[in-house]
Amino acid sequence: MLERAGICAGVVLFGSMATHAQITPPSTLNRTVNLNYVYAAELGFGGYSLAGLTAQVYTLPLDYTVHDVLHDGWALRILAPVQLGLYSLKVTDTNGERISIDQQSVALMPGAELEIPAGKRTVFKPFAQFGVGHTFGVDAGSPNFYVFLAGARAVSQWHAGVTTISLGDAIIFAGDSPIGSGFSEHYVSLQLGLEVRHPLGFRVGSLAPDLGVYTIYYYYPVPLAFSRFLEPELKIVNQGEIGFSIGSATQFRWLGLSNPRIGAGFIFGGGLTVLRINFGFHL
């Protein structure tokens, strides 16, 4: 059965909640599948499949920015993302029995990010989030959990004509635990990324559409861990991501959002591949 043991930060992913799927037939082989919700929480909006487990996370990225907080030029982003996770485990046991388990989760991940200019090109962004969630679909273990993310990001920008080049890095500590007894987890992520944006050469009204392409390297000194039914635990130390986003080189607002972007990314390496929707270069 699926038992709550972890947490989620978005969905999958990457999020992550610590719910887990627990299959109980007696054997020396692994029959406990822990849903890595804390990875889902960081992932935000995407999904992956691994050893019979399919995970999908959908995040409504609500936030509000207050300008000139604590100091002129500083900004405070109030974060209130709402995350929905959909998980499906379909595996076959050693005796040929087919096992199918579905579970859902909902989490609220409030937090704050302080944007501190450091010179003309760089913005330093310490942040913290702490949220709670609830799982549905399996009547086992604690259905409630908490998840946390904390760390700092920094991004620097240069302009070469109409081209914008961004270099970003981040350090993130993330974890989750059930409210009550059960499985908990955490990991540390070091990230380094590069994005190049360039206008597409035409206008739509006042908008000047542009295309951004990016790459990000992930290093986990405390590895990502994914349990697998009847298989050894998968531990990931290195991953890469490539992706793109579309937006406008001119300033605009849409549905209350300032200069929104949307795109897609592909995360690979360490035995896990992930597809995600992004809302711009996320470092």
Q: PLM features: residue spans?
A:
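Short loop/turn motifs that connect adjacent beta-strands in outer-membrane beta-barrel proteins
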Residues: 65-77, 116-124, 157-165, 200-211, ...
